[in-house]
Curated annotation (Swiss-Prot):
Segments of skewed composition (Polar residues): 81-90, 214-226
Compositionally biased spans, kind Basic residues: 69-78, 246-255
Alphabetical keyword list: Activator, Conidiation, Sporulation, Transcription, Transcription regulation, Virulence
The name this protein goes by in its record: Developmental regulatory protein wetA
Family note: Belongs to the wetA family.
Region listing for Disordered, in residue ranges: 65-97, 206-369, 418-552, 587-613
Keyword Transcription regulation: yes
Effect of deleting the gene: Leads to slower germination, lower hydrophobivity and lower virulence of conidia.
Functional summary from the UniProt entry: BrlA, abaA and wetA are pivotal regulators of conidiophore development and conidium maturation. They act individually and together to regulate their own expression and that of numerous other sporulation-specific genes. Acts as a crucial regulator of both conidiation capacity and conidial quality. Plays a role in virulence.
Database matches in InterPro entries: WetA
Amino acid sequence: MALWTSSYPVDTGDRDPSFAWPDTDVPSAGLDESQHDLFAQFLDFEAGHGSTSSATVAVAEPFYMDPSHHHHHPHHHAHGESSTTSSGVSNADEFDFLSSSSNPGAAGYDVDPSTLAMFAQDPAAMYSTTSGVTVSDTELERLEGISLHSPKKGDGTFADRAASPTPVAAPAIAVNATTNAANTTTNARRSKKIVDALSSTFRKATTMRKTRKVSQTLQRAVSPSMENPPMAIKPGSAQSAAPVPRGRRAHRAHTQHALQHQQQQHQHQQQQAHQISESPPILQINTGLANSGGFVAGQFEDPFGGEISPTHAPQPQSQPPQMRYYSQGGLGTPLDSPTRSAAMLQQQWQQQQQQQHNGAQQHQWSAASSQQELWWGGAAGGGAIEAKNIDANMAMHSQHGELPYDVHADAGRVAPNGLLIHMPQPRPGSSSVHDLSLNAHTYLPPPPPVPTENTRSARPPRAPSSGARHHHRTTSSSPMRKQRGTSVSPSPGGNGSGGGTRQSRHSSGGSAASSSQRSASGRVSVPGTPSSSGIKKRRSRDAGSGSFSADEAGGFTLVGGGGGGGGGGGGGGIGFVNFTPNDGGVLMTGVAPSGSSKTKARREKEAQERRRRLSEAAMKAVAAAGGDIRKLREQGFEL
């Protein structure tokens, strides 16, 4: 057995009686007052594993005494020797880190070299001479094997994490038991926190490294795919840490999966072919050909015999099966379960039955097709009807450009909002136009609504900003004037609505335009009835459009005329008075001039822009519907 010793020199001046280690007191050490075993928290001979039996080492010296006991009770040394040797540890009351011998004035801590030489020759003499320190060979080996792991005992014991003592070759260096014990206690206490931090760091690093290795291994081994199905791996076993070999075994498994997948696809296709053969053919109408064929002006010629139109012929059954299924055989398509072996045998038996019935089914198909062709009677004339409809639509488009909006059929129709809103209709003529109904692409936008009678009250004369400001002020005897021949042109066939007394109304408009929109070819007609008291005033862009003519349908058509105009009606007929610059005195009596002409010009410009946008939208709609814009322009449609 070898004895390792080290020196801890301390000057005499440093021995302060009030000196105390702050970390070794009971409250700072984290111990209860009833727990006085301080050495037990620093030494753990089992290395925190509990695999070896605990050993008791007496590291306390008989000199650990209270200073008061040291001076007044010299006989306490022997008692300290017996108590510390028998118990293996010392109580807190016996600690004295300042007095190392019976002589308080001793300044040295060295031991006689002759004693060390005797210990080197006869190690057993050390146990007989120094009864305070007794360490056996097995206990010394346990001290050398102390690990840095934290103790796992719950009684507050901690492993001694101080560095192992290094052998010193100089025999002249001795150790003092009191200083050595104090040094061990102090170093263990001070290094406790550092060693705890280091051990926790090692533990975290080791745990993270192990966890990372296991997770990487699992990710490599468990990553599923269509060729390599996932394998059950136990995370705790040692075999799971090794990656799955990817050699001939993996290649063989991949080949087997590919062959199985191809076989299942082939069987699935055969099953689909069998199901198709058992069902009769379906007559599918090709809507694309039916719609596009309508633009052909003429009768269809059937190249197959004339019984059925080619647009309604049955579709051939030569479509490849793999085209009907999206992403067949891809990663998102699940494989068929291998437990369906009985179903596969049944499919093979059905395929054999299919081959026997092919001849009879083909005969049945031909008979069924001929019967289904006969009951649908509209197959032969469908293309002609489509072509006829297209021609009629083109004719109606051409008529809209040159016709005024003559609404006699919709004159009495009241919209849900209570206003008389009409739809543009073609001139009564060919019967093919009457058989058609307008859709969203064939009619122009409707005009603005016309207010009802309760909104058309008589108004006083307005400001000259309404468009009737003129410099030629010729006095007029009365607003009731006879009709001038050049301003009114009643339409032939009128039923007296154009004649009669002309009752004028003080109109504030420079020209009383209709409340409908203007087409590109001229003024448009508005819905009206003989019982209406008047029409709503609209400012006109030019002053030469104030004359009106009444037709037999009750609509009003602007035909051109003199200057500003005012409209009025009442009694049994509808009459109009055309105001001229000579009537300026009547229209501008008591009215101060204003600068509303700018507003008038701005509004007229906005109306013109609105009409232009509507016309462009109509042309775009016609072009989108497949019409010929050039022909429409030739017929009268212009942007």
